[in-house]
């Protein structure tokens, strides 16, 4: 693979990550507060927000998965680098983002849905010290943290994908 192809793949990766981060940030910072303020029930607002977050989770899988093309293209091209260089650090951050996607969509979101289904009533009707309310609040807090950490990772990965090596370095003795 030549440098031009790698540059195009990097631009595609950055664009997808920025697109997802913008959508997630727009929802998290702008739309979710409006839902909870304007809708008559926090339960309805939470249900709608949960549906949107579920779709953003799937979009995150797509964005982060396709961003892996930047790493995969370098692997195919056998781009070499130092032991701890930008490619390895970027790859580690990318894997962390994928693990966060997995945790969110396979562990936390199903747990929140199971708690809501088990309760069968609006969350705010439960006492603050109710075991279901405590479990729901904890899962919801973890969900929010994973959501915003993935936004930060998407922005970081998009901003640094251009720093990844693009050509195979000749390994020779250094003087």
Language-model regions, residue ranges each:
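Interfacial loop at the N-terminal end of multi-pass membrane proteins
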Residues: 2-88, 113-137, 172-174
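Hydrophobic alpha-helical membrane-insertion segments
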Residues: 18-22, 93-109
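Selective detector of the "anchor" transmembrane alpha-helix that sits immediately C-terminal
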Residues: 19, 62-69, 145-166
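Helix-loop junctions at the membrane-solvent interface of multi-pass transporters
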Residues: 39, 73, 107, 160-163
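Membrane-embedded alpha-helical bundles that form the substrate/pore pathway
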Residues: 54-57, 141-148
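Alpha-helical membrane-spanning segments of integral membrane proteins, especially the hydrophobic core
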Residues: 86-99, 138-141
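C-terminal/domain-terminus segments
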Residues: 162, 169-175
């Amino acid at each position: 693979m030549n440098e031009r192809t790698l540059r195009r793949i990097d631009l595609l990766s950055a664009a997808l990550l920025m697109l997802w981060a913008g959508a997630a940030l727009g929802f998290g910072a702008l739309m979710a507060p409006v839902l909870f303020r304007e809708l008559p029930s926090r339960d309805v607002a939470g249900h709608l927000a949960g549906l949107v977050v579920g779709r953003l989770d799937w979009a995150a899988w797509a964005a982060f998965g396709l961003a892996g093309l930047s790493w995969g293209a370098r692997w195919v091209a056998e781009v070499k680098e130092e032991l701890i260089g930008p490619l390895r650090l970027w790859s580690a951050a990318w894997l962390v983002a994928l693990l966060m996607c997995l945790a969110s969509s396979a562990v936390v979101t199903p747990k929140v849905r199971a708690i809501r289904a088990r309760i069968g009533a609006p969350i705010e009707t439960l006492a603050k010290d109710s075991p279901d309310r405590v479990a729901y609040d904890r899962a919801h807090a973890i969900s929010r943290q994973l959501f915003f950490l993935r936004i930060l990772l998407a922005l970081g990965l998009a901003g640094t994908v251009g720093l990844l090596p693009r050509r195979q370095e000749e390994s020779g003795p250094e003087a």
